[in-house]
Amino acid sequence: MKVYSLKRILAFGLAALMLLAVAGCGKSENSSGPNSGGKDASSSGQQGNADVLAKYIDENGKIDTSKLTPYKAAEVATVNGRNIIKHNGKPYLYNALHFRYRGLESGLAAPIAKKMFEEGMQKIKESGVDTVILYIYWEDMYDGKTYNFDNLKYQYDVAIKNDLKIQINWFGYDNCGYGGFRKWQKLRSKYPALQVDDPDITEEVPDLSQQIFVDEEIEAIQQLCAFINIYDKDRRTVAIQLENEPDMGEGGMGNWLSQFSVMVDLLNKLGEAVHNSSYSMITKINLTMSGWDEVWEGLDYPARVNKVIEQPHLDLVGPDLYDTNTTQDISFYNKGTNIPAHLELGPSVWSAIGQGVYHLINGYGMGWYDLIDIGFSGHHGLYRLNPDKYEERDGTQILGTPYKGEIEGSTKEFIAMSNSVGALKELLASVPTSDMAGFNIKMKNVASDTKKLGDKKITYDYSNPSAKYGASGLVLKGPDGAYYCFSSQAADFTFPSAPSSVTYGSYNDGAWSEAGKAAANGAKITLEPGKAYRVVL
């Protein structure tokens, strides 16, 4: 989606020091609990009725929202002293994989693009990640006169067939600094351009303070939510990202820095439109490090980020830096009711495993970018696309920009960890972060890492001197007093005393479902990758 410069990567570290020095600001929480009556998001099956929208739309394809019963699918809640997402009334672990259908369409013939999209959805299901992030472009559902939801129907049908939860990435006026005027917004007397004196802004920029721009995008967002209300019968849609990297100036639009407060106001109004729509869900914003060393409207980078977090209708604000082999601290975003999330986190690099464990123990979300690299260069994705099949990564090197020879991870190892995470997602989404510990997050190939949970010391041992990188593990204390754990590769956990019971399985609806028993060697337990364990001392 973008290319990061070395300057930007280096800037992240310096900016992080700036960010951590800034005091946190609160955010008002969207009130009221979820409505009842929706099916659980895990129920499967396609909609099976291509004309399900027919009775709701007019001659221009617009949905009559007055005919719909509003539904609140997801919201921020405080549970066990931490901010969490509740989806259909249950804790939801933000563990999602990006997959862009348009990226396939732009690089492949239509039949092959559909084939690869459908196979890709199966790959996501098999990966252990339970949520796909679909990319919805304004112009794919509206041409200035008529709404057409066929593209959305197709993407939803394939996601539903594979029983995946859904998040939406919405592309409107700003997309990595591209976007700007819509194709139908040509008449400048009706759609005025912003008057700006900045040599870095090389394209016409819509003056987003003008009500017509706000009204048109709000209508589009409301229509999208109405479509979801009707078509997503299982209420599996959790969240919507408003715009994409609104602070990125890559495309020469400069919307963010040229009219910062106006852009933030627009984002909040879009969030309000979602919260008051026929399908209310989590709203999120992804930010880059663009302009981290600049002051605009009297605000430096940390102050600008704080202003976004403070907005009452933006539930989740986080960064999307992913082209690095060091664990990134995003605690700066942990303030008010905001739930920090790494909105674009590369699964292709070896460090993704340790970064994932870091996010889990801190209660942060993970938006894995992506299933395959949309540029067909093989850099970002969990899989390589070559050119019409999915190839697993096997730990060789990522040769191109922006990774510059960095060691890639293993697709199999990522899937193993995801299966372990999936087995414990209910606990990972809700237990206090003080009851979780991550081990060997830096992924050394020889490590003995001891952490304390309450009054218990637990040691994680991994040793493979010939490996390019090591493994990482996690332990949490459940509400039943048992310890739940996993490791990304075979490794040992040593507890303070010999356990009375060690089993593997999954935790669902408040109960442990045992799949088998495991042996302990005194106080030591050897974990296999891909499993989740329950240890009773």
PLM segments and residue spans:
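The substrate-binding groove and active-site-proximal loops of carbohydrate-active enzymes
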Residues: 96-112, 135-150, 197-219, 246, ...
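Aromatic-lined substrate-binding rim segments of carbohydrate-active enzymes
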Residues: 114-189, 260-281
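C-terminal beta-sandwich/jelly-roll accessory domains of carbohydrate-active enzymes
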Residues: 448-537
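C-terminal motif of bacterial Sec signal peptides marking the signal peptidase cleavage site
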Residues: 20-24
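N-terminal carbohydrate-binding accessory modules
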Residues: 45-129
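Active-site-adjacent "subsite" loops/lids of carbohydrate-active enzymes
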Residues: 152, 173-226
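Aromatic-lined carbohydrate-recognition surfaces of secreted/lumenal glycan-active proteins
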Residues: 169-171, 232-245, 260-303, 318-322, ...
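Catalytic-core region of carbohydrate-active enzymes that cleave or remodel glycosidic bonds
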Residues: 164, 274-276, 303-413
